Amino acid sequence: MNDISQKAEILLSSSKPVPKTYVPKLGKGDVKDKFEAMQRAREERNQRRSRDEKQRRKEQYIREREWNRRKQEIKEMLASDDEEDVSSKVEKAYVPKLTGTVKGRFAEMEKQRQEEQRKRTEEERKRRIEQDMLEKRKIQRELAKRAEQIEDINNTGTESASEEGDDSLLITVVPVKSYKTSGKMKKNFEDLEKEREEKERIKYEEDKRIRYEEQRPSLKEAKCLSLVMDDEIESEAKKESLSPGKLKLTFEELERQRQENRKKQAEEEARKRLEEEKRAFEEARRQMVNEDEENQDTAKIFKGYRPGKLKLSFEEMERQRREDEKRKAEEEARRRIEEEKKAFAEARRNMVVDDDSPEMYKTISQEFLTPGKLEINFEELLKQKMEEEKRRTEEERKHKLEMEKQEFEQLRQEMGEEEEENETFGLSREYEELIKLKRSGSIQAKNLKSKFEKIGQLSEKEIQKKIEEERARRRAIDLEIKEREAENFHEEDDVDVRPARKSEAPFTHKVNMKARFEQMAKAREEEEQRRIEEQKLLRMQFEQREIDAALQKKREEEEEEEGSIMNGSTAEDEEQTRSGAPWFKKPLKNTSVVDSEPVRFTVKVTGEPKPEITWWFEGEILQDGEDYQYIERGETYCLYLPETFPEDGGEYMCKAVNNKGSAASTCILTIESKN
């Protein structure tokens, strides 16, 4: 079209005169040849223009198809990025912990992804409809402009054609000698010239109409091809049904089919991705099973092999194996808990006061738990410790009982001496001194009572010290009274009855003191028993921590050995770092915590690009929320549990994934009861 407009401008702007003065005298045959030559020249020009126009349209179509393809790739990349962002946001959202199976969780995730895909497709459809409307308006404007240009060319076409025809005449036609009958020739030539001009005008109009009809389907075809680039077969099928009145309906159908194809493709990709994740998860779980159990399971599978039903048999055996493992783990945990309860109750019954016991048991436990590889079972070690502790506590209890018997005999002897002294007091005659002694004894008893109440609040050493001081002071007072009574006894022989009756007060005072001593001893025993139980609990917790530390150390050594075997050397670690795949600088470690206390799992992960971290518990993913909180600081990632329960104990896993690879680290959380 640009070539036509340029030629039209050149012809209109040219000031070349048309040679009308010289008209050669030709015969009829020469006029016919001239007309045929002009016709051929016109057809060649039209063919050349049509070829140029087709070539230009073909190049434009190729450019548009390439541009649409690139634009489609960019849109798909953006859509995939949006899908990844949306999926990561959905994982970060707080979702309560589901108690269903893994299949149910995958179904829920599939529903969420389908909903997001549906929303995205609706937005894309709206955007494409708007874009198509804009393109339609643009094409209509271009068609209107082109129609105006064609009309302009038609208006100026007759003049240009006549000029070109005259030029061709000047170039191709050679004049010959004219006939002498000039009158006839002039008349015939004018008639022929009129007929020729009329034919040229009619033919030019027909040519213009044909060219316009040729351009209309080509424009429509270019539009349809630019809009529908995904499926060439469908586009060819739709070209047959294209008509001016049904263009919009056909485009909508094609758009709907394209959206459906995209939706199906996205669903297939999501389904494949879910299947790959399931397979990876199942493979990770199978790798964590012990080798012995795997050998047994494989033997069972081979025994249960049936030709033609391999898949069904394997699934049945796998289900049975999982149920057996779960039942064995529950029985083992129940048996271990019962043994620990029995051992703790037995140790609690046989526990006796031992101030030096924490240090002694600490040294003993340290002697038993020497660093290195442990060759003994921890349950057997715990049983041996409990037996030795039981035997030692029995010996100490016997020794303490003998010591208490000796102290009781000594106290009874002292009480007997005091009773004899009280009988000697009954023989006294000095009533006033006895009354004074009685008063002083009651006052002393009150003072002793207040002192014993204060002493009860002191420590055990201070209590023993105070008792010894009080006994020494009482012995001194008793000796002084004995000396006075002995002197008075030698002076007088008569004995009054009333003073003897009054002397019962010191005896009753001594009896009350004995009861007081018994109460004090009982209170002291109860307090010591309570302290013993606390020390026993602390000692058992300390031993449990040491056992857990030994277990953890053993596992760390095994992991280091496995890591050295798998990784080989630091050079391989450097190669892994350069590759960009995620790997754990600081893996998870086994942890034990008291019930209802918080716990934190910490790892250090590196990778390029930055890996995506997820936490798992017993094969189920943990969502970020109030119960399980995700914490991220640079390369350090934490899982924080603000409160723990007995059912939180088990295996935790941290999984890091990026486009270069994946890595995982596991640990065992042990929940200890408060009692």
Curated annotation (Swiss-Prot):
<dbReference type="InterPro" id="IPR013098">
    <property type="entry name" value="Ig_I-set"/>
</dbReference>
<comment type="function">
    <text>Involved in regulating cell migration through association with the actin cytoskeleton. Has an essential role in the maintenance of Z line and sarcomere integrity.</text>
</comment>
<keyword id="KW-0009">Actin-binding</keyword>
<dbReference type="GO" id="GO:0051015">
    <property type="term" value="F:actin filament binding"/>
</dbReference>
<dbReference type="GO" id="GO:0051493">
    <property type="term" value="P:regulation of cytoskeleton organization"/>
</dbReference>
<dbReference type="GO" id="GO:0007411">
    <property type="term" value="P:axon guidance"/>
</dbReference>
<dbReference type="GO" id="GO:0005886">
    <property type="term" value="C:plasma membrane"/>
</dbReference>
<dbReference type="GO" id="GO:0098632">
    <property type="term" value="F:cell-cell adhesion mediator activity"/>
</dbReference>
<feature type="region of interest" description="Disordered">
    <location>
        <begin position="254"/>
        <end position="278"/>
    </location>
</feature>
<dbReference type="InterPro" id="IPR036179">
    <property type="entry name" value="Ig-like_dom_sf"/>
</dbReference>
<keyword id="KW-0206">Cytoskeleton</keyword>
<feature type="modified residue" description="Phosphoserine">
    <location>
        <position position="564"/>
    </location>
</feature>
<dbReference type="GO" id="GO:0007156">
    <property type="term" value="P:homophilic cell adhesion via plasma membrane adhesion molecules"/>
</dbReference>
<feature type="modified residue" description="Phosphoserine">
    <location>
        <position position="80"/>
    </location>
</feature>
<dbReference type="GO" id="GO:0030334">
    <property type="term" value="P:regulation of cell migration"/>
</dbReference>
<dbReference type="GO" id="GO:0008307">
    <property type="term" value="F:structural constituent of muscle"/>
</dbReference>
<keyword id="KW-0122">Cardiomyopathy</keyword>
<comment type="subunit">
    <text>Interacts with F-actin.</text>
</comment>
<dbReference type="GO" id="GO:0005912">
    <property type="term" value="C:adherens junction"/>
</dbReference>
<keyword id="KW-0963">Cytoplasm</keyword>
<dbReference type="GO" id="GO:0005925">
    <property type="term" value="C:focal adhesion"/>
</dbReference>
<feature type="domain" description="Ig-like">
    <location>
        <begin position="582"/>
        <end position="670"/>
    </location>
</feature>
<feature type="modified residue" description="Phosphoserine">
    <location>
        <position position="241"/>
    </location>
</feature>
<keyword id="KW-0225">Disease variant</keyword>
<dbReference type="GO" id="GO:0015629">
    <property type="term" value="C:actin cytoskeleton"/>
</dbReference>
<feature type="modified residue" description="Phosphoserine">
    <location>
        <position position="357"/>
    </location>
</feature>
<feature type="modified residue" description="Phosphoserine">
    <location>
        <position position="569"/>
    </location>
</feature>
<keyword id="KW-0597">Phosphoprotein</keyword>
<dbReference type="Pfam" id="PF07679">
    <property type="entry name" value="I-set"/>
</dbReference>
<dbReference type="GO" id="GO:0030018">
    <property type="term" value="C:Z disc"/>
</dbReference>
<dbReference type="InterPro" id="IPR013783">
    <property type="entry name" value="Ig-like_fold"/>
</dbReference>
<feature type="region of interest" description="Disordered">
    <location>
        <begin position="487"/>
        <end position="513"/>
    </location>
</feature>
<feature type="region of interest" description="Disordered">
    <location>
        <begin position="313"/>
        <end position="336"/>
    </location>
</feature>
<dbReference type="GO" id="GO:0070593">
    <property type="term" value="P:dendrite self-avoidance"/>
</dbReference>
<feature type="region of interest" description="Disordered">
    <location>
        <begin position="1"/>
        <end position="66"/>
    </location>
</feature>
<feature type="compositionally biased region" description="Basic and acidic residues">
    <location>
        <begin position="27"/>
        <end position="66"/>
    </location>
</feature>
<feature type="region of interest" description="Disordered">
    <location>
        <begin position="551"/>
        <end position="584"/>
    </location>
</feature>
<dbReference type="InterPro" id="IPR007110">
    <property type="entry name" value="Ig-like_dom"/>
</dbReference>
<keyword id="KW-0965">Cell junction</keyword>
<dbReference type="InterPro" id="IPR003599">
    <property type="entry name" value="Ig_sub"/>
</dbReference>
<protein>
    <recommendedName>
        <fullName>Nexilin</fullName>
    </recommendedName>
</protein>
<feature type="modified residue" description="Phosphothreonine">
    <location>
        <position position="370"/>
    </location>
</feature>
